């Protein structure tokens, strides 16, 4: 059983929901990333999504695009992201870490080498935004052989066939994108989310995490009624952008604790 699967079993047994924050590796400062990851755990995060910066993040809105640009400007690569996970693992061997990014850096490294190095670094899952499930059977199998959960996106526009394909090859959790468009959007309709999630559950018993448009404790709580976990990304990146010098770590921990408290209430 994978670390992510075990975590969701524990959450379900205790009647809790998962909290999955996203940060971009290397933003605002590569030297700060591991410290931010530990702050996420202290605040009550269940899983950490660590974004691999990319020059053309097509699914991301301006907030995460800026974040990627800042990280790339500071020389962050897929290799340095893996080094950050390795450093994080020196103090935390239990919190699942998912690498989230785009196909190009992985393909440049090669899927076989990526799987080997990611596993050695302590990565538990991988979500490649521009890998549709129907084209990734071999990639998903290679990840599972390495002990890494392949995670896939579903959206309001996903066909029944795509839902079935994702259900067949995904493990860990499925990431349901709550709305059309890019990350950072704010028009979240929780009724739409609640109506679509049961259709996904008809095809799979894999936990469903919902992201896009979750900006605060209230929206996180509302989405968690139907989802197994909530994902927060752009709001966190904005918080880090706006944090006064030297206060990013504490600001992040405080914000995550507010979300955790809301989910547990």
From Swiss-Prot:
GO cellular component assignments = cytosol
Query: Would you say which domain of life the source belongs to?
Result: Bacteria
User: Can you state which reaction this protein catalyses?
Assistant: (1S,2R)-1-C-(indol-3-yl)glycerol 3-phosphate + L-serine = D-glyceraldehyde 3-phosphate + L-tryptophan + H2O
What would be one Pfam family of this protein? Trp_syntA
Would I find Lyase among this entry's keywords?
A: yes
Keywords assigned:
Amino-acid biosynthesis, Aromatic amino acid biosynthesis, Lyase, Tryptophan biosynthesis
Pathway given for this chain reads:
Amino-acid biosynthesis; L-tryptophan biosynthesis; L-tryptophan from chorismate: step 5/5
Q: What is its EC number?
A: 4.2.1.20
Active-site residues, Swiss-Prot/TrEMBL: 49, 60
- GO molecular function list: tryptophan synthase activity
Q: What class of enzyme is it?
A: lyase
InterPro entries, per the entry: Aldolase_TIM (IPR013785), RibuloseP-bd_barrel (IPR011060), Trp_synthase_alpha_AS (IPR018204), Trp_synthase_suA (IPR002028)
Q: State the protein's purpose.
A: The alpha subunit is responsible for the aldol cleavage of indoleglycerol phosphate to indole and glyceraldehyde 3-phosphate.
* Assembly: Tetramer of two alpha and two beta chains.
Q: Which PANTHER family match?
A: TRYPTOPHAN SYNTHASE ALPHA CHAIN, CHLOROPLASTIC, TRYPTOPHAN SYNTHASE, ALPHA CHAIN
Family per similarity comment: Belongs to the TrpA family.
- Per its record, how is this protein called by name? Tryptophan synthase alpha chain
* Organism whose genome encodes this protein: Polynucleobacter asymbioticus (strain DSM 18221 / CIP 109841 / QLW-P1DMWA-1)
Q: What is the lineage of its organism?
A: Bacteria, Pseudomonadati, Pseudomonadota, Betaproteobacteria, Burkholderiales
